[in-house]
């Protein structure tokens, strides 16, 4: 682990896993198109990424032009996180990137390969983070929306602009939602890749046509706090109710409320039990934990008999 992400030295090859900055040479892997995993490409090195990731990156203002989806003994593996998200398998090493093994609407859970060395994220690597089933979540949210509709209240579902907003668009399409303009742009790109998301108006057009005055209605918007000007406007003018979605909503230790009227646990990452299942399915000899509760999850795995350690800066090259 370095200040520029995870670097693995395997034989004569140098592999940069989700580097924060472009590298001049070696092999780089970009697992998915969330902003904390992207960088502008430069140099002569080989960059491995999915086509979906590169297209979403361009939409978000990043330049990834020269890339490969296949290279020698490197295999990308579906990570189930967002559209185009991949893990990387090479030399019996599996790097998960951000991963979810749970099916969520159109998003299918990750493919999990056997490996000798597992480098896994553990965003929710604490036992308190065990999420409700998708069916239970959808049922609960539909009940909330129905109750609010009965009172004539418009509802805004809030989730990350890339990934969760598309899951929400799919799961609650029967309410014929409007989309925040930024969500609409991402949804259109998802449709380009065959994801069956319903077309709808963006919020600017819907408001300009007076459609938001015809309450109740549903809207899918990016994750924003109650202090955001857009949310304050929607509440003051239309008396809208907000429902925020995040894995952090599972824990009372984290104040995910952020001024939302409701907070619902829903994540594009593995929960604690799913992380344990991931480890069992990989059946590795060595485990490195990255991103999240790295110390706690590694300690739990060690108690279960695994050879696990949190990945700190400059620690990985000593072992791989």
Predicted regions and their residues:
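Active-site-proximal loop/helix segment associated with metal-binding centers of metalloenzymes
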Residues: 81-91, 99, 103-104, 117-124, ...
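Short, well-ordered alpha-helical microsegments
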Residues: 38, 85, 103-104, 164-168, ...
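C-terminal regulatory/interaction regions
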Residues: 2-3, 206-320
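A short, well-structured beta->alpha microelement
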Residues: 1-21, 67, 104, 192-217, ...
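His/Asp/Glu-rich metal-coordinating catalytic cores
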Residues: 2-23, 27, 33-156, 163, ...
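Binuclear metal-ion centers of metallo-dependent hydrolases, dominated by the metallo-beta-lactamase
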Residues: 1-3, 111-112, 126-201, 206-211, ...
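Short, conserved loop/helix-junction motifs that constitute active-site signature segments
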Residues: 41-43, 110-114, 172, 233-238, ...
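Short internal beta-strands
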Residues: 45-55, 119, 176-186, 244, ...
């Amino acid at each position: 682990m370095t200040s520029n992400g995870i670097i693995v030295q395997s034989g004569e090859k140098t592999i940069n896993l989700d580097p924060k900055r472009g590298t001049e040479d070696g092999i780089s892997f970009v697992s998915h198109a969330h902003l904390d995993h992207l960088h502008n490409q430069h140099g002569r090195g080989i960059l491995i990424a999915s086509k979906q990731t590169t297209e979403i990156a361009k939409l978000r203002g990043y330049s990834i032009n020269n890339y490969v989806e296949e290279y020698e003994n490197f295999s990308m593996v579906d990570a189930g996180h967002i559209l185009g998200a991949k893990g990387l398998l090479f030399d019996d090493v599996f790097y998960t990137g951000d991963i979810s093994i749970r099916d969520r609407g159109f998003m299918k859970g990750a493919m999990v390969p056997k490996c000798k060395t597992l480098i896994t994220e553990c965003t929710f690597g604490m036992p308190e983070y065990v999420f409700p089933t998708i069916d239970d979540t959808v049922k609960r949210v539909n009940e909330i929306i129905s109750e609010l509709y009965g009172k004539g209240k418009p509802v805004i579902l809030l989730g990350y602009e890339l990934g969760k907003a598309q899951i929400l668009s799919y799961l609650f399409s029967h309410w014929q939602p409007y989309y925040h303009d930024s969500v609409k742009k991402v949804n259109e790109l998802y449709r380009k890749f065959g994801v069956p998301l319903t077309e709808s108006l963006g919020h600017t057009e819907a408001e300009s046509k007076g459609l938001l005055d015809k309450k109740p209605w549903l809207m899918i918007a990016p994750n924003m706090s109650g202090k955001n000007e857009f949310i304050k406007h929607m509440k003051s003018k239309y008396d809208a109710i907000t429902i925020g979605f995040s894995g952090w909503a599972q824990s009372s230790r984290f104040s995910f409320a952020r001024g939302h009227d409701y907070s619902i646990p829903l994540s594009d990452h593995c929960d604690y039990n799913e992380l344990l299942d991931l480890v069992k399915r990989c059946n590795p000899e060595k485990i490195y934990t990255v991103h999240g509760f790295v110390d706690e999850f590694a300690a739990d795995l060690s108690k279960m008999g695994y050879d696990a350690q949190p990945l700190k800066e400059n620690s990985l090259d000593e072992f791989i």
